[in-house]
Swiss-Prot record:
It comes from Dennstaedtia punctilobula. It is a peripheral membrane protein. The lineage of its organism: Eukaryota, Viridiplantae, Streptophyta, Embryophyta, Tracheophyta. Produces ATP from ADP in the presence of a proton gradient across the membrane. The catalytic sites are hosted primarily by the beta subunits. The keyword Ion transport applies. GO terms for biological process: proton motive force-driven mitochondrial ATP synthesis. ATP binds at G154, G155, A156, G157, V158, G159, K160, T161. This is ATP synthase subunit beta, chloroplastic. Its EC number is 7.1.2.2. Disulfide bonds: none annotated. PROSITE patterns: ATPASE_ALPHA_BETA. One of its GO terms (molecular function) is ATP binding.
Length: 486
């Protein structure tokens, strides 16, 4: 069926059809033609509303420059479908599943619609198990669930993208299977950095693209809101193929889920809906639920989703992060205070949570160590006001010891990342869970009280911290002798 455009408002089009030929909601419409300069136009839109008088309102997934009233819009009769399967690995696709890198078209015989139902309740798998990330503070305090949903919460500039990139690197190498990464409304530079990092670490194999382990789907900041709103669904669809057809365990990375919400807010206003709290769309909960409920584990395979969540003005009660956190199994909250001290990853040990932090899941030893770290950190937080007003010397001997150990824990929580070697100047470290538990177990009772604080900073494990302390001592002695002779 062919309709014609009656109105264009930014990325939103009104299209009139003949009586009885109206497209369904979510059907894709294709507008083809030429602009006044003679350039070809090919715009795909998605039907969002049926207006009456045989008109529909659709949202464009690409720029509407050059479109004019009266141009024809073809109803494809189905929702947007994208290529899925092994041919997408090693490639960068856009929201339509079209490749945006150089190696040519994606040769796939299988396509899935991007709007799919969540698995039925009877298909879900409720098995509880953790997976190791190699990041000390995460594995100890807020372990991630295999087949769960995890959120990295943080304001602007506290370091969300670097941990996401590190996790892609660690999991793609250690996990060995395939993964899918969705760039939702983020910077083009970050997408390019991730692509280069993947090629460097051989997760994307340019020589033999079929051996690549990751599929990338990008809808970056400069895209229209229709593309940014649906790129998360495209990434989920690609991950669902590996879960349902190949029966694999698939990590799905989304950076950044708030851009999905913001795109929905832009579209909602253009569709004429009354805004809700803080200007967000009234359908925020429904839109978030329809995306998040598809990301789950079934008896056939699993999708483990790790999502970066931008927190506007560092306010975790903002409707967007608050709605997101309701769907998550673990939250890793990044602290601006820790980032200001140069402690990366700036994970807040007290705000970060996980449903897996239970003694019958992670084991008594792990649980007790994590609780000890949290108690020490909480006591340090309580004492900070007293220290700021009266100074450290006014504390009791016991409290001074607690503060010293808490500061050591804080610094030992920092870790050099493989993807951040150029920034830190230290080789990246993957730290196993037994090493992590051993390190914090030694700090808590005071076995490392003789080590200077700076020895724990950017150290992978206890052995490295001890070696750094010895090096610092030698350096200090050398400087001391130099001062005497000078």
């Amino acid at each position: 069926n062919v309709g014609y455009i009656t109105q264009i408002i930014g990325p939103v089009l009104d299209v009139a059809f003949s009586p009885g030929e109206m497209p369904n909601i979510y059907n894709s419409l294709v507008v083809k033609g030429q602009n006044p300069a003679g350039q070809d136009i090919n715009v795909t839109c998605e039907v969002q509303q049926l207006l009456g008088n045989n008109e529909v309102r659709a949202v464009a997934t690409s720029a509407t420059d050059g479109l004019m009233r009266g141009m024809g819009a073809v109803d494809t009769g189905a929702p947007l479908s994208v290529p899925v399967g092994e041919t997408t690995l090693g490639r960068i696709s856009n929201v339509l599943g079209e490749p945006v890198d150089n190696p040519g078209p994606v040769q796939s015989n299988t396509t899935f619609p991007i709007h799919r139902s969540a698995p039925a309740f009877t298909q879900l798998d409720t098995k509880l198990s953790t997976f190791e990330t190699g990041i000390k503070v995460v594995d100890l305090l807020a372990p991630y669930r295999r087949g769960g949903k995890i959120g990295l919460f943080g304001g602007a500039g506290v370091g969300k993208t670097v941990p996401i990139t590190e996790l892609i690197n660690n999991i793609a190498k250690a996990h060995g299977g395939v993964s899918v990464s969705g760039g939702v409304g983020e910077r083009t530079r970050e997408g390019n950095d991730l692509y280069m990092e993947m090629k460097e670490s051989k997760v994307i194999n340019e020589q033999n693209i079929s051996e690549s382990k990751v599929a990338l789907v990008y809808g970056q900041m400069n895209e229209p809101p229709g593309a940014r709103m649906r790129v998360g669904s495209t990434a989920s669809t690609m991950a669902e193929y590996f879960r349902d057809v190949n029966k694999q365990d698939v990590p799905l990375f989304i950076d950044n889920i708030l851009r999905f919400v913001q795109a929905g807010s832009e579209v909602s206003a253009l569709l004429g809906r009354m805004p809700s709290a803080v200007g967000y769309q009234p359908t925020l909960g429904t839109e978030m639920g329809s995306l998040q409920e598809r990301i789950t584990s079934t008896k056939e395979g699993s999708i483990t989703s790790i999502q970066a969540v931008y927190v506007p003005a560092d306010d975790l009660t903002d409707p967007a992060p608050a709605t997101t956190s309701a769907h998550l199994d673990a939250t890793t909250v990044l602290s601006r205070g820790l980032a200001a001290k140069g402690i990366y990853p700036a994970v807040d040990p007290l705000d970060s949570t996980s449903t897996m932090s239970q003694p019958w899941i992670v084991g008594e030893e792990h649980y007790e160590t994590a609780q000890g770290v949290k108690q020490t950190s909480q006591r340090y937080k309580e004492l900070q006001d007293i220290i700021a007003i009266l100074g450290l010397d006014e504390l009791s001997e016991e409290d001074r010891l607690t503060v010293a150990r808490a500061r050591k824990i804080e610094r030992f929580s920092s870790q050099p990342f493989l993807v951040a070697e150029v920034f830190t100047g230290s080789p990246g470290k993957y730290v196993s869970l037994p090493e992590t538990i051993k390190g914090f177990q030694m700090i808590l009772p005071g076995e490392l009280d003789n080590l200077p604080e700076q020895a724990s900073y950017l150290a992978g494990n206890v052995d490295e911290a001890t070696a750094k302390a010895a090096a610092l001592q030698v350096e200090g002695q050398r400087k001391g002798w130099y001062r005497i002779f000078a």
